[in-house]
Amino acid sequence: TDTKESDFLAEGGGVR
């Protein structure tokens, strides 16, 4: 989770 994009992708693919 480096950036916002990487964060949501790592968290749950942006479905969070």
From Swiss-Prot:
Compartments it resides in: Secreted
A GO BP entry is: blood coagulation
Q: Does the keyword Signal apply?
A: no
- UniProt keyword annotations, A-Z: Adaptive immunity, Blood coagulation, Coiled coil, Disulfide bond, Hemostasis, Immunity, Innate immunity, Secreted
After translation, the protein is modified as follows: Conversion of fibrinogen to fibrin is triggered by thrombin, which cleaves fibrinopeptides A and B from alpha and beta chains, and thus exposes the N-terminal polymerization sites responsible for the formation of the soft clot. The soft clot is converted into the hard clot by factor XIIIA which catalyzes the epsilon-(gamma-glutamyl)lysine cross-linking between gamma chains (stronger) and between alpha chains (weaker) of different monomers. Forms F13A-mediated cross-links between a glutamine and the epsilon-amino group of a lysine residue, forming fibronectin-fibrinogen heteropolymers.
Its Gene Ontology cellular component terms are:
extracellular region
Protein function: Cleaved by the protease thrombin to yield monomers which, together with fibrinogen beta (FGB) and fibrinogen gamma (FGG), polymerize to form an insoluble fibrin matrix. Fibrin has a major function in hemostasis as one of the primary components of blood clots. In addition, functions during the early stages of wound repair to stabilize the lesion and guide cell migration during re-epithelialization. Was originally thought to be essential for platelet aggregation, based on in vitro studies using anticoagulated blood.
Known partners and oligomeric status: Heterohexamer; disulfide linked. Contains 2 sets of 3 non-identical chains (alpha, beta and gamma). The 2 heterotrimers are in head to head conformation with the N-termini in a small central domain.
Query: Per its record, how is this protein called by name?
Result: Fibrinogen alpha chain
Organism from which the protein derives: Halichoerus grypus
